[in-house]
């Protein structure tokens, strides 16, 4: 689709772009679709539904097929969320939770094109095989960092204890009676 992508910084006054973020710039000439001419075209495009929630809610399925959570689980959820137990329609809440769980299960079962590629960037609660970060790797990573003068970063300019009322040898001084003797 794109020939190449590169990360670049857009510089303006003071070395920062107007929103302080990095921008992606395409060096290729990719065409996605017709260019929008005005805000009405954008609103029309965004208001057109691509898919309906009703497809995945299972409204046509009978309520007997749904497996509602137990009444004890619903009461526990109500207590944990701080909602009142008194006057709560437990049966209605069970059916709503069953429909929501059914919807979530159907979303998880939707086939995704290029699933091998998307698994690397999966944001679901999936265990990832990451390498453990230890103290030596952290120090090694810090040693390779350099300040960017274009962004106004100056090496050694920040002192953590600079605004502290009392400090000694670049450490904060905490007195025992600090919170006890407050007025």
Curated annotation (Swiss-Prot):
Q: How does it sit in the membrane?
A: Peripheral membrane protein
Q: Which GO terms describe its cellular component?
A: glutamyl-tRNA(Gln) amidotransferase complex; mitochondrial inner membrane; mitochondrion
What's in the keyword line of the UniProt record?
Answer: ATP-binding, Ligase, Membrane, Mitochondrion, Mitochondrion inner membrane, Nucleotide-binding, Protein biosynthesis
Class of the enzyme per the UniProt entry, highest EC level: ligase
One GO MF term: glutaminyl-tRNA synthase (glutamine-hydrolyzing) activity
GO biological process terms, alphabetically, are:
glutaminyl-tRNAGln biosynthesis via transamidation; mitochondrial translation
Reaction(s) catalysed by this chain, per the record, are: L-glutamyl-tRNA(Gln) + L-glutamine + ATP + H2O = L-glutaminyl-tRNA(Gln) + L-glutamate + ADP + phosphate + H(+)
Subcellular location(s) of the protein = Mitochondrion inner membrane
Functionally, this protein is described as follows: Allows the formation of correctly charged Gln-tRNA(Gln) through the transamidation of misacylated Glu-tRNA(Gln) in the mitochondria. The reaction takes place in the presence of glutamine and ATP through an activated gamma-phospho-Glu-tRNA(Gln). Required for proper protein synthesis within the mitochondrion.
- What family, per the record? Belongs to the GatF family.
Name the record gives this protein: Glutamyl-tRNA(Gln) amidotransferase subunit F, mitochondrial
Task: Say which species the protein is native to.
Answer: Saccharomyces cerevisiae (strain ATCC 204508 / S288c)
Q: Which gene specifies this protein's sequence?
A: GTF1
């Amino acid at each position: 689709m794109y020939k190449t992508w590169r990360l670049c910084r857009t510089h303006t006054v003071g070395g920062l772009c107007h929103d302080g973020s990095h921008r992606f710039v395409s060096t290729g000439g990719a065409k996605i679709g017709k260019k929008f001419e005005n805000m009405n075209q954008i609103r029309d495009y965004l208001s057109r539904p691509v898919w309906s929630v009703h497809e995945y809610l299972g409204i046509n399925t009978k309520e007997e097929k749904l497996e509602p959570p137990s009444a004890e689980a619903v009461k526990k959820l109500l207590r944990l969320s701080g909602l009142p137990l008194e006057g709560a329609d437990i049966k209605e809440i069970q059916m709503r939770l069953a429909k929501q769980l059914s919807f979530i299960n159907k979303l998880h079962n939707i086939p995704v094109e290029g699933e091998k590629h998307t698994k690397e960037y999966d944001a679901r609660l999936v265990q990832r095989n990451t390498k453990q970060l230890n103290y030596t790797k952290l120090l090694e990573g810090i040693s390779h960092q350099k300040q960017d003068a274009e962004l106004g970063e100056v090496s050694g300019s920040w002192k953590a204890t600079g605004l502290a009322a009392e400090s000694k040898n670049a450490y904060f001084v905490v007195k025992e009676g600090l919170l006890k003797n407050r007025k």
